[in-house]
Amino acid sequence: MNQIWLKVCAASDMQPGTIRRVNRVGAAPLAVYRVGDQFYATEDTCTHGIASLSEGTLDGDVIECPFHGGAFNVCTGMPASSPCTVPLGVFEVEVKEGEVYVAGEKK
């Protein structure tokens, strides 16, 4: 089965330390993070409480949820602090010809 890729933005549109929400038709939104020169993507909804992680605070490779302050590693989706215990789904990201693309399905 071929992977569907979603075009997010030009890589230059996201500075290091920024987050962008990606709305998908018929699916839950994603959060795309720029950590240094690398891009990562996870589910945008916190697994602990219904909050948008793209509205949280990115500190290095850790996103803090704006709802209860729990955190996740954006590279792996693994919880980084309580009260979060359930990992986030992560999505492959590629940069091609200066454009950021996110896979339509989880890794």
From Swiss-Prot:
Which GO-annotated molecular functions does the record name?
2 iron, 2 sulfur cluster binding; dioxygenase activity; ferredoxin hydrogenase activity; metal ion binding
> What SUPFAM superfamilies does the entry give?
ISP domain (SSF50022)
Q: How does activity depend on pH?
A: Optimum pH is between 7 and 7.5.
Q: What does the cofactor section's free text say about binding?
A: Binds 1 [2Fe-2S] cluster per subunit.
This protein's record includes keyword NAD: yes
> What is the protein name given in its UniProt record?
Ferredoxin CarAc
Name the cofactor(s): [2Fe-2S] cluster
Say what the protein does: Part of the multicomponent carbazole 1,9a-dioxygenase (CARDO), that converts carbazole (CAR) into 2-aminobiphenyl-2,3-diol. Acts as a mediator in the electron transfer from CarAd to CarAa.
Please name the gene that encodes this protein. Answer: carAc
Tell whether Protein biosynthesis is among the UniProt keywords. no
Q: Name one GO biological process term.
A: carbazole catabolic process
